[in-house]
Amino acid sequence: MLKCLFVIAVVCSMVACNKDYTGQWVSIKPGKSLRGWDTDGNKKDFGYVGDTLLLTGQSTIYYSGRINDARFKNFELLADIKTEPNAVAALWLHSGDVSGYQVLINNTPTSEERRKTGSLSNVRNIYKSITSDNEWFTLHVKVVKKHITVKVNNILIVDYVEPDEPYRTEENKGMRFSYGTVALSNYSNNNVKINSIHIRPLPDQEIPERKDALDEQKDEIIRMQQANFPVIDFHVHLKGWNQEQAMAHSRKIGVFYGIAPNCGIGFPVTSDADIYTYLDTTKNLSCFNAMQGEGREWPTTFSEKAREEFDYAFTDAMTFTDHKGRRTRLWMPDEVWIDIDHEKYMDIIVDRIVKVLKEEPINIYVNPTFLPEQMMPEYDELWTDVRINKVIEALVTKRIALEINARYCIPNEKIIRAAKEAGIRFAFGTNNADSDIGKLEYCIDMMKKCGITERDIFFPVVKPVKSQYVTGK
């Protein structure tokens, strides 16, 4: 009788192990003894408070349970997670000894780790979390062949297709889609809480393969991502496209955007109420919220409280009152009156730039050193050392970053080198006139020529956001 019961138990166990879970959501949350998971560290780095799993130390746990024999290729995963301040963790996918991708978990705006929650590490880095510490959020990852999407609270953050020949550095050569287990790593000594983890294996057959991967062998952006250089266009406008189109393009090319409305008299945003209305439309966008101040009246047009709702503010000095009291806009040929010699007019431009930098509440000076079209052929001669130094001194004094502008290809290399020597931070920006935004080509060229490193790049301190928590399974 006992022998018969033993055989039945073994058979039942084998049936359970061999069960096909394809298309089914299954919990793979570790048991309180980490049942179904292995660890590369001390089990004391993991524990439970009630039904909540705690990752308390710098260790990794690997799923080793019975679902798909812990070998996943096409799948979806949902996890409900909460972080303490300064916690940095990761979810590993297709993990093996030296392979796999990791999705980062980091919600602290001021942490030294700039890559935030949802980042597909060093492939599609995200620089602003749409959730906050001490709040539950849902991480949703889906892998189909060579296509991965990452959602946070049901908001699409990453949409990446791995090409047949991806660009990978030697350090990151294991970042390839194949198959493997999933793992959780805590890179800090701050707690990460896991309320649930569910996985759904997907079928191998009848899944069309995405064919819209970029050619990474010729792509500069992936090289910067692999080097953990912050790939950010701080100066993007919704001109010629809408929010959804801009976000889709950002995800595709791997450049994180700072999207700015034009704020000032005669522009789309003209009041504090307009600011709050605009920001209400950006709650579900994975981007920086930037403010472009227009004209010289903008600091008094908007309250300080409303201005500070943005992640950062910028302006240029292209609008000013000239030597005869005429309102001048340097980029509009019919609103520029050069009735004195170019040297004298250049002194007026420099004086107006310095005044703007000293008096207006900005983080970045954009469209920098711009000259009207009549004077552009003399750009290098007109921007003398004395004039350059006046602008650099004002930037240093007010701790303002200098934009390297991809659209106008300014400032020139000489000015950028002088700014770097003075310790000024840089922001790459486009100031697009339409949806043909490019990929920061001039900025990257100057980065290489002038030896700009990731520590030379401006980075805003953003306010924590209120999570729009959508529970998982």
Question: Where are the regions that the model predicts?
Answer:
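Sec-dependent signal peptide recognition
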Residues: M1-V7
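Bacterial Sec-dependent signal peptides at the C-terminal "C-region" and cleavage site
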Residues: A9-Q24, R223
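Carbohydrate-interacting regions of secretory-pathway proteins
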Residues: C17-E216
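Short beta->alpha connector loops
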Residues: Q58-I61, P85, H237-N242, Q292-W298, ...
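Charged catalytic cores and adjacent phosphate/nucleic-acid-binding surfaces used
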Residues: L214-A227, Y379-K473
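An N-terminally biased module of ancient metal coordination in phosphate/nucleic-acid-related enzymes
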Residues: L214-E297, K305, P372-E381, K390-V391, ...
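Structural preference for beta-strand elements that scaffold enzyme active sites
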Residues: P230-D233, F256-G258, S286-F288, D311-F314, ...
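Extended substrate/RNA-proximal surfaces in nucleic-acid metabolism proteins
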Residues: S271-T397, I452
